[in-house]
Amino acid sequence: MALQALQSSGVAFRKILSHFPEELSLAFAYGSGVYRQAGPSSDQKNAMLDFVFTVDDPWHSKNLKRNWNHYSFLKVLGPRIITAVQNNYGAGVYYNTLITCDGRLIKYGVISTSVLIEDLLNWNNLYIAGRLQKPVKIVAMNEDVALRSALDQNLKSAVTAAFLMLPESFSEEDLFTEIAGLSYSGDFRMVVGEDKAKVLNIVKPNMAHFRELYGSILQESPQVVYKAQQGSLEIDKSPEGQFTQLMTLPKTLQQQINHIMDPPGKNRDVEETLLQVAHDPDCGDVVRLGLAAIVRPSSMRQSTKGIFTAGLKKSVVYSSLKLHKMWKGWVRKTS
């Protein structure tokens, strides 16, 4: 695993982090405010900075004392309710958005360590796990062995899922585009509110960062011939090879594939279904449907939850910014 530590931007990010309680298992920054993206947001020098903080109780109670004004009306219900909303609704993450901090506009999501580990290993929501399949800047990380192991496994699972949706031979860009798109499969925001060229806009300017993130996994994988200098890869597309890959997919994705393929009344076990899928010429399409079955409901629940966690006014402003970004992308493509 090669999650990227801070470089020149480290001091600015750490200054922002100093405004929050210190008890963080992991803090990372992501998005167009951190990594250059092609497309309509490429010229935004002061793009909003996106953060995710991985925490344990009683983080919200401490943050409410320091940053009361960051929260919506839910703050009057207290930290216990906020934590319950965070863990039990949407994708397990609580976002405060459109916050001014150290002269920058920021958005930060808060997720519990245990919920993140579950998502990284099993892809229950593929929400924050999906963010961590793309290049991010690690601002802080403790020595939690279980979390570090789960971060590594999430990257390996992303590679395996992408392999199943690719042909026998493909390029690095093909692979990284599939990986970057995993957590957008079925995401309704890609229809309303997001620039539809978003995945390519993420990958093309950041090929070196993707290589840094996935290079060692590809070099060590027995499933692929990786010609790094040529930027090309070859994988085993035999039913046996695909079955091996399907059996190592995260549990929730396996269950969704089983649900899609299992006829009513059959009640086959997951392994039997995956063996059938391995022999199916449309194996990659089935995997894609399984991903969409995870992402679609979790993205919708999380966006609905955002109305309450951000408050109605901020939700309207934030949605307007997203729609403006989508419009700029459409104008750019048609001009």
From Swiss-Prot:
> What is the protein name for this chain?
Phosphatidate cytidylyltransferase, mitochondrial
Q: What is its EC number?
A: 2.7.7.41
Highest taxon of the lineage: Eukaryota
Give the record's pathway: Phospholipid metabolism; CDP-diacylglycerol biosynthesis; CDP-diacylglycerol from sn-glycerol 3-phosphate: step 3/3
Cofactor names from the entry are: Mg(2+)
Q: What chemistry does it catalyse, as a reaction equation?
A: a 1,2-diacyl-sn-glycero-3-phosphate + CTP + H(+) = a CDP-1,2-diacyl-sn-glycerol + diphosphate
**Which key words tag this protein in UniProt?**
Lipid biosynthesis, Lipid metabolism, Magnesium, Membrane, Mitochondrion, Mitochondrion inner membrane, Nucleotidyltransferase, Phospholipid biosynthesis, Phospholipid metabolism, Transferase, Transit peptide
Q: Give the organism the record lists.
A: Bos taurus
Primary location:
mitochondrion
> What gene codes for this chain?
TAMM41
Q: Which family does it belong to?
A: Belongs to the TAM41 family.
Q: For this entry, list what GO says about its biological process.
A: cardiolipin biosynthetic process; CDP-diacylglycerol biosynthetic process
Which GO terms fall under molecular function for this chain's record?
Answer: phosphatidate cytidylyltransferase activity
Membrane topology note: Peripheral membrane protein
State the coiled-coil residue ranges: none
Q: What is the enzyme's main class?
A: transferase
Q: Which GO terms describe its cellular component?
A: mitochondrial inner membrane; mitochondrion
Q: What does this protein do?
A: Catalyzes the conversion of phosphatidic acid (PA) to CDP-diacylglycerol (CDP-DAG), an essential intermediate in the synthesis of phosphatidylglycerol, cardiolipin and phosphatidylinositol.
Give the location in the cell. Mitochondrion inner membrane
Query: Do you know which InterPro entries this protein is assigned to?
Result: Tam41
